[in-house]
Amino acid sequence: MQPDFKKIHSFENNLINKRSLKDLMYQAFLNYGIVKSSIIADRVKNLTFHFATQSGVSLSVEDLRVPAKKRELIGLTRNEVETTQKRYEIGSITSVEKFQKTIDIWNNANNFLKDDVLTYFRESDPLNPLYIMAFSGARGNISQVRQLVGMRGLMSNPQGQIIDLPIKSNFREGLTVTEYIISSYGARKGLVDTALRTADSGYLTRRLVDVAQDIIVRESDCGTTEGLWATELASNNFLNLRGRLLAEPIFTQEGNLFAPANTEITETFLQTLKTLKDHSPIKVRSSLTCTSTRSVCQNCYGWHLSHSKLVDLGEAVGIVAAQSIGEPGTQLTMRTFHTGGVFSGDLTRQVRSPMEGKIEYWEGHKASLFRTMHGKMGFRLKEEVNLIIKNSFGTTISFEIPAESLLLVNTDQYVYENEIIAEIQKDTNLILEEEQKEIYSETSGEVFFNALDVKVQADKQGNTYKTNNKAGLIWILQGSFYELPAFSETLLKPGLNLSKNTLLSRTPLYNKYPGWVQIDKSDNGTGICVQNFSVTLTNAFINEKVENSSRLQIKTDNQDFQFQLTTEPNSVLKQGDTIAVLDDNTYRTTTGGIVTYSLENPQASKKRKSVKNLFKGYFYWIPEETFKFSTLDEVRLSFSKNESIVGVGEEIMPNTFSKVGGFFQIKEAEQEVTIKPGELFELTSAESQIFDKSDRFVKPGNFIVPGKIITQQLVYLEFFELNEKQYILARPVQVFEVPKEEDLSLSQSFFPYNSHEHIKLKVIKRVFYKNWEKIISNNGINLLQTFIVFDFKQEQQGLEPRLEFTPSKVPGKSFLKIALYEVIKTFENNRKSSHSSLPTTTRNFVSNKQYVASNTLIGQIETTAGLVNKLAAINPHLNSGNMKEVLILNPSDLKKVFCPNVELLKKVSVGDLVRIGTLLNDNVKSPYSGQILEIFEDHILIRLSQPYLISAGTILHATSNNLVKAGDILATLVYETIKTTDIVQGLPKVEELLEARKVLHNALLAPCPGYAYVRFNKHGESTVQLIGLDNEVQTLALKPGIKTKFNSGDFVEVSSALTDGLISPHTKLETLFSYFKNRYTSFEACKLSFKLLQLFLIGEIQRTYRSQGVDIADKHVELIVKQMTSKVCIEDSGTTTFLPGEVLNFQKMADIALVAENKGEIPPSYVPLLLGITKASLNSDSFISAASFQETTRVLTEAAIEGRKDWLTGLKENVIIGRLIPAGTGFNYLENQERLAREKGEIDATFHREAKPLSENILDLRLVKKE
């Protein structure tokens, strides 16, 4: 290969780093070809390995040198952060600006530290192993070195937002616990990204291969004269023309031919072209404009990039393009992992003053006033500005500030060395998203709006909210926040001085029900109750504290019943509560067993605490002992007794003895031992034949064994087999009778006498076991228990039942009484808020045991100030039904500022709001932010206040003159932020573009080129007025809150974005076609629309990759985008047989339309269609390829119904069928086959023309063929 451009190399004694090595290999490859380059690479490898082995480089802890300047730099940075905090506290910047400024301060500190690390290594320790390793390209990078010996820096949280607490330590010094926790965010994110996104990248590659696999270089020249201008290329870089062919000749300024069409653009060509002063525009051939059918030609594709010469015929360039775009996705995934999730804010480049001096520039430049992200005011430049700095020695420095930059200085302003004078935005197409940040009040106080323009707006649901349309301040005038009791009456007005016992408010207390007053005094305050109703048991006495519990004795005519109380006196009762349980062992068993019963009240047998009447019936108890064991060793001694009869008192397990004796069984599966009392009878074989073997009861006098054994008592028969013999166990049954006891009744005395319907005490009996339930117990159980329960039907709200003991005439005995009380809520026992800490007392207007009618004023709650202070405000927006809010000024909320002769030189008045640094008189600045409360002869009294700066567009939650607590939301700042360009945005963004997905919140696009203006109607609604080149006026509605991307009067191109938001490619295509179809034919309009959309998509995809530091040749992206924009959809079939909605290839459609026109028929009308890579694959001409990708059944079914043919033109369908693929060597083979077929076809055609006169029908023709 002849070299096109040789760089003259001479001996250089320099350090070769990664970049130099890359440049060396690039030059070798460019000038000497693949073979020689590989030899050079091999020799370089051997050389470096040899010396690396000899040097024995090893990394130790001592090699990690932390720069000495680090401590000083961290100190300076902290001071700068503190200054920013002070600016925020005086209301000069918003919380968002403070956050952004803090992040930028730490980011700049990090970058300075990184430079220090590099300077130290380069100048003081160039042979440091860490430095050699990172900068030779062996392992690691500058970011990792910075984290090792500089500082770890700022981290992002899982939501992608930056944490404003930087990690100041490095890995050499070690992280603190807090830093370690924050640090782990990024590390985890990197690991998760690596795992998840690799799968996404692989799937993206598969889809790309599927859409482009049939693009093969099939011919040398398609013969097109079309191409792309150099300015239209996505990279827009002069060097990226290399490897393409000229579509049009280039002429010099004099009109001489410099290069003819189809000239290859090489390095030499470009170097020579640079020497020309002026030349005609460069137009190059591109895959986008190639007219080859289902392929691309050599001249339009250009060089094969791996060996810098024209691509060969048969090259599968589609596969190469798909892999070139898909493979970097895997690299992008790892991007976060390499930097450990560390944030790097390289979005703007700061221009600093190179020296001290005065700034000069022409003031007539177009610019708009702009507030930076840090809260500084500056100018957004619309055009380039020439900046000049002059110092006192006459030295002048001038430099250019490009358009769209931020200028932060005025003309004639004096600047210092290293002062930031401008910010240049690196990428004008950054991803902006709207964010919200809530502002919380740091103190309690009164809200005051200063210079805000409040407007009420409504959302789509009709909910109203307040917004601020102008930057201003929200002041919180400090004070202590208190809540007064509900329905309280405020006695004072704001501004009054308060003493310790000044009465602030009073709350009247009324009773709802009549009754007797009961006043309880405790540590929690005074409680007032009104007894409305009571019931007393007159035939029941309480013996207090008998055997550590209270006993209830109920006397009837026949006997006394003893109950044990289960409820403590003075306790509050609920419906169904148990008051007492009867001491009765009548229904108690000695062991466990099986219970069954026959009762007249079956509902009472259910296990629930319901109030039921007394019932009668019988319990049948079959006793049985059950013992649980954990290991077989515990029952090993009893194995010999298994399945035999044991006696009473016999030892079953260690220290465990049988109480009843009986049939002994060991059940290993259940880990239990059972002893069933009863007699065991063996059955003969004859008896077992006629015996009813079901378990059952046998009444006294009946046979147990027919004709043999009669029982004298009720028994329960159980049948079982033992050692192949059959036995009956007759188990004794205990019968417990439940008589209907009518003598146990409660004599109840009610007061008032007419109100006894809704409260009662009832005697009920409860069974707690289900019928036929087996109960495991060694100590016995109560089958039936008698209870006294509380029955309460609450018809009147607000009454509380309580159990009480009423003294009787007999000493040591009391009556049982239940009383209903209305509890009057006082403020002491109703305190729900932590802010209600003002002293309160309850004043009673009634005495104990006094009878009161309903709605009587029985007392009031009084709230006092508690300290010597001042009442500042009462919340005016609360009605009397809610808790009232007051603000009280304590001495700590007021500050004195001494000012001599203040009246003579004062610059402030009472009521003024001042910030820190405001002049109070000619000599004294205010050390506090606040409100001037009073001015005295020698001092000023300031009420401390906190100002919050609010930007335009902020949503307001607080109202002026309202009171707020510390932590209440005041407002929500709405601002724009730049998304961190991490892979989480990168790879999905590429996928979104390639899949041509619909975009939410898309930008408004210009329907035609023209001059754009923003107009407002009388309702305040904004519209965009577009005056086209033909003076046609179009009006476009703007949604509320949407920002425009142009200034009124700017010229906008067709389909350019007029508002903020993402551009939807589908909307862009529709806009372009609707504009062009009125000016050109359908074919031309479609072609133009596709071309502009293709350039847009290529630009967007390339921008996303380049923002991640990945470089892909434009020609690869062009091939994929061409596949996405090659289909049209038929709208009207004309006189053809096509159906509306049918999707066809654009070139095929153009040919059909041309034929229809030539024949005088109406051609079909169609619109351009943008397909994502998945849909483009499924709409492939080859149904075999489409079916092997996705939706196999649907694709094959449709192909069968339509009777489609697959011409096997691509690689995939040939692989599936098993044929030779038409690429590489297979391409030449198939070319030869086609050539032979063509030649044979020509011979056959000649023969047919001669054979035709012999016969007119096909049969004769076949006969002639056979001959």
Swiss-Prot record:
Give the EC class as a word. Answer: transferase
Record bears the keyword Transferase:
yes
The cross-references to SUPFAM superfamilies, in alphabetical order and at most eight, read: beta and beta-prime subunits of DNA dependent RNA-polymerase
Q: How is the cofactor bound?
A: Binds 1 Zn(2+) ion per subunit.
Q: Which residues bind Zn(2+)?
A: C222, C290, C297, C300
- What Gene3D superfamilies is this protein classified in? 1.10.132.30, 1.10.150.390, 1.10.1790.20, 2.40.50.100, RNA polymerase Rpb1, domain 3 (1.10.274.100)
Location in or out of the cell: Plastid, Chloroplast
Per the record, its GO cellular-component terms are: chloroplast; DNA-directed RNA polymerase complex; mitochondrion
The cross-references to InterPro entries, in alphabetical order and at most eight, read: DNA-dir_RpoC2_beta_pp (IPR012756), DNA-dir_RpoC_beta_prime (IPR045867), RNA_pol_Rpb1_3_sf (IPR042102), RNA_pol_Rpb1_4 (IPR007083), RNA_pol_Rpb1_5 (IPR007081), Rpb1_funnel_sf (IPR038120)
Task: Please name the GO terms that the record assigns under molecular function.
Answer: DNA binding; DNA-directed RNA polymerase activity; zinc ion binding
Q: Which UniProt keywords apply?
A: Chloroplast, DNA-directed RNA polymerase, Metal-binding, Nucleotidyltransferase, Plastid, Transcription, Transferase, Zinc
User: What reactions does this protein catalyze?
Assistant: RNA(n) + a ribonucleoside 5'-triphosphate = RNA(n+1) + diphosphate
Q: What does this protein do?
A: DNA-dependent RNA polymerase catalyzes the transcription of DNA into RNA using the four ribonucleoside triphosphates as substrates.
Whom does it interact with, and what assembly results?
In plastids the minimal PEP RNA polymerase catalytic core is composed of four subunits: alpha, beta, beta', and beta''. When a (nuclear-encoded) sigma factor is associated with the core the holoenzyme is formed, which can initiate transcription.
What name has this protein been given in UniProt?
A: DNA-directed RNA polymerase subunit beta''
